[in-house]
Amino acid sequence: MSKFLFTMLPANDLGLPTRLVPIARVLADRGHDVAVFNPAPAPARLIEEAGLKNLPMPSRAMPDSWTDSAQVSSAWDVEQLFGAAFGSEEFVRASTALHVDLVRDFGPDVVVDSFGLFSCLAARILQVPLVSVLQGNFHPASDGFVWWKGERPAGLPSAAAAVNKVAAENGVAPVVRSVDLLAGDLYLIVGTPETDPLPATAVVAYIGPIVWQRGNDTLPDWVAALGRDKPLIWVYSGNPRYAGIPTPCDSIVVIRAAIAALSDAPVQVVLTTGYQDVPKEFSTLPSNFHHAAYLPGPAMAERCDLMVHHGGHSSVMVGMITAGVPADNPVMTEL
């Protein structure tokens, strides 16, 4: 049997883990030695409930990171996003060293990654085969998040200079763009050519929508008790707050808009927050709102009449493709 290490950008939301956990679970069920790495609270909860091993954060001092959240939330493409988030050479060096420790200590035969810049660089440094599991607009050949705006503007931020300095220190050839480091020995694209189009020259395998739900997962009785005399709307906010202060990446706007639009409507609303707490400003929800930190996505999508979400790729896969549920996704421009 083989050893597989699943890595990702360690964001505190469920978008990336919900595409990797199903693959990891299948490999573990087949007897392979499987580990996942995402210590953020919400992903860690999902990984634990899937019965998978989540590796701890390697012990290494890390510098403060500086991120331009406004540019991250409005980035033209992944290259600008990485430039806005990972422009500090000191942070790139420390993050790369941490991920080299992680990969070396576990000793995988294969790294399976989704959007983890530093785990991809670590795999190159240690010469471990890399499988990249990406949505179409994360792929290096993509036209970006706002492709309809035409030609990409010149002079957008890039992390290439910082990344190449650290890569050279570790004997890895430079890249033209930092996004090129996501290039795996095998590309698996979550979605279809219609939902996640790429140029014909991109050598990828489309694997369709990947969604997570344990085979025995069912909805709690209180959802069934809501009855069917009124439409059931599922509101999924993703992470309402990514930091102690508001940032442009927060999905709290989804909850605010849903309450404003639906609190007096003749509907039942189920609000889920992906293992996140409901923000304090919503300490008392409207009487027709019902909150759960997490519910199995495919089951909830099949039960609801309408899904309102933050525009995350995995949410689109759950609602529109898996269950054919009408959806409104007001935040992410690429969807």
Question: Could you describe each region identified by the protein language model?
Answer:
Residues 1-122, 128-140, 147-148, 268-321, ...:
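Glycosyltransferase specificity loop/lid
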Residues 2-5, 232-234, 325:
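Residues that mark the start of a beta-strand
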Residues 9, 81-87, 103, 159-164, ...:
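Short, basic, glycine/proline-bearing loop/turn elements
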Residues 24, 201-306:
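Donor-nucleotide binding loops and adjacent catalytic segments primarily
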Residues 127-129, 186, 231, 268, ...:
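Proline-centered loop/turn at the N-terminus of a beta-strand
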Residues 145-151, 180-182, 301:
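A conserved, positively charged/aromatic
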Residues 153-241:
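A nucleotide-sugar donor-handling region in carbohydrate enzymes
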